[in-house]
């Protein structure tokens, strides 16, 4: 066998071993997270059912029933998110294809048009038309949409939001970035937890602490890497790297 082909096969095997090792560590941590979250939901249901059993006032009973309905919706949401994480961490051989990066950013921008217009947001996309990665389309769609949604969600209330999206080939890598001038993140305080499951860093009622975890997991499942730079009240930049060969 040609030495270059043998070397390529060796690199592919090493990469597969590394990915599998990372996924196994995630699943071990995931078991603890499931246990913690389901116990929390169970305790909430038990408490509300206890209140309902002891309550005699009909108005108060209805209020508790509404709270039970909300608790049920929250549980379903949690199970849905956990299911997504399981799928990412256990399906490493999902069919891949060439994914046009600019196409997915344009589609995400179109989906978010109502929010963009309502909040007078400026989005600039500077990506070569033919720049692509070898990945999983559904993962890539979620990654792009989640990062743009985050930028919009965590904008500064009294400042026009500008989002700059760039993409290029660099030193054998496909690199694209999403830069905003939003409220930013204190990385000295939160950097080591930024991509953790159920970690939130802002007082936003919509924050669930799952989006960035799923985003990072999907990027890594496709052989990529994500890094972040940020400064409070200045903005945040996410950079995603994929090998050209993927």
Predicted regions, residues:
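PAS-associated C-terminal cap
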Residues: 1-15, 19, 246
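Conserved micro-motifs of the catalytic ATP-binding
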Residues: 90-95, 132-135
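Short alpha-helical segment of the dimerization/phosphotransfer core of two-component systems
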Residues: 70-75
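Short conserved segment of the HATPase_c
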Residues: 185-198
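Conserved glycine-rich
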Residues: 224-225
């Amino acid at each position: 066998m040609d030495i270059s082909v043998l070397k390529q096969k060796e690199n592919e095997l090493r990469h597969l071993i590394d990915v599998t090792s990372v996924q196994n560590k995630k699943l071990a941590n995931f078991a603890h997270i499931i246990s913690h979250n389901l116990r929390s939901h169970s305790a909430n249901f038990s408490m509300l059912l206890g209140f309902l059993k002891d309550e005699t006032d009909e108005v108060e009973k209805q209020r508790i029933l509404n709270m039970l309905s909300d608790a049920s919706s929250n549980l379903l949401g949690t199970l849905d998110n956990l299911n997504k994480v399981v799928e990412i961490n256990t399906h490493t051989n999902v069919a891949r294809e060439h994914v046009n990066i600019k196409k997915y950013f344009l589609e995400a921008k179109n989906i978010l048009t109502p929010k963009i217009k309502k909040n007078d947001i400026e989005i600039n996309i500077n990506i070569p038309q033919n720049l692509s990665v070898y990945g999983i389309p559904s993962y890539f769609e979620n990654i792009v949409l989640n990062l743009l949604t985050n930028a919009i969600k965590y904008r500064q209330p009294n400042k026009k939001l500008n989002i700059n999206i760039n993409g290029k080939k660099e030193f054998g890598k496909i690199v694209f970035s999403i830069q905003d001038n939003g409220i930013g993140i204190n990385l000295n305080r939160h950097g080591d937890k930024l991509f953790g499951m159920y970690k939130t860093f802002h007082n936003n009622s919509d924050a669930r602490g799952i989006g960035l975890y799923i985003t990072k997991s999907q990027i890594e499942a496709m052989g990529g890497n994500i890094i972040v730079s940020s400064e409070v009240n200045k903005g945040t930049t996410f950079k995603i790297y994929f090998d050209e060969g993927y």
